[in-house]
Amino acid sequence: MAISTIQIILIFIWSSVVGMGSVLDEFQTHRPLIACSIMGLILGDPKTGIILGGTLELIALGWMNIGAAQSPDSALASTISTILVIVGNQDIQKGIAIALPVAAAGQVLTVLARTVTVAFQHAADREAEKANFTAIIWLHFTALIVQALRVSIPTTIVAVFVSPEEIKSMLDALPEVITGGLAVAGGFIVVVGYAMILNMMSVKYLMPFFYQGFVLGGYLKLSLLAWGAVGLIFAIVYVQLNPKFATNHNNGTGGSGGTVAAAGDHPAALPEDELDD
């Protein structure tokens, strides 16, 4: 498929939003599930965008910045891989093979962009000494634009200068050992990502629910949506039966009914005029 001028403009705008989202973290627009889905919608194939985004999201679950160490750039990997997969009419496995090296290249661009923005922060410090708030605001927005261009420029270059025929021939030229190896590595990364998250979320008194999910999953043929609903129900029931929640409810924080019950059970909690009567 050929990319129209309107699509190129929308790609530039959306990739800029994705780049800013990678440092703002407020709306999570840099996450693969969101970035790929919207990019797929722009290119007219939201289904492929959602599938690719969900697959890359599993891989990127364990990616996180630790101190000054930058994780692979899921934002740039999401935008470029979606364009190459949809425009080049490739499968999801090829998209994973594309995304992993692009994420590594984006990691270098992230370090470079963050290094450049340090100069803007020092300039903002100097303006703060002069109480020049307008300049401080503009300097912060300018630093944010650097993060936007970090993703939008490479993505737009790929969308403008790489034709579908070139994409197809380039990806088809990759040896099977490379694409297959990257696909297997991507599967390992998914497992590692899940393991890291489960290790952080590991709470002994919640582990029975975790094991119960595997047991039920082996016998009940339910969809992921149904399992999500079952998990939500278990969570609600657990919170309602939790002694801490019950204590707060009995103390009156759960509503007017709880307050009346607490007052009836404890005469000392009644007003003084009622005690005098």
From Swiss-Prot:
InterPro entries: GatZ_KbaZ_carbometab, PTS_IIC_man. The keyword Cell membrane applies. Induction: Induced by L-sorbose and repressed by D-glucose. It comes from the Bacteria. It is found in: Cell membrane. GO terms for biological process: phosphoenolpyruvate-dependent sugar phosphotransferase system. GO terms for cellular component: plasma membrane. The chain crosses the membrane at residues 1-21, 92-112, 133-153, 177-197, 219-239. Residues 3-237 form the PTS EIIC type-4 domain. It is a multi-pass membrane protein. The keyword Ribosomal protein does not apply. PROSITE patterns: PTS_EIIC_TYPE_4. It holds the Pfam family EII-Sor. Its main location: membrane. Keywords: Cell membrane, Membrane, Phosphotransferase system, Sugar transport, Transmembrane, Transmembrane helix, Transport. The phosphoenolpyruvate-dependent sugar phosphotransferase system (PTS), a major carbohydrate active transport system, catalyzes the phosphorylation of incoming sugar substrates concomitant with their translocation across the cell membrane. The enzyme II SorABCD PTS system is involved in L-sorbose transport. This is PTS system sorbose-specific EIIC component. It comes from Lacticaseibacillus casei. The lineage of its organism: Bacteria, Bacillati, Bacillota, Bacilli, Lactobacillales.
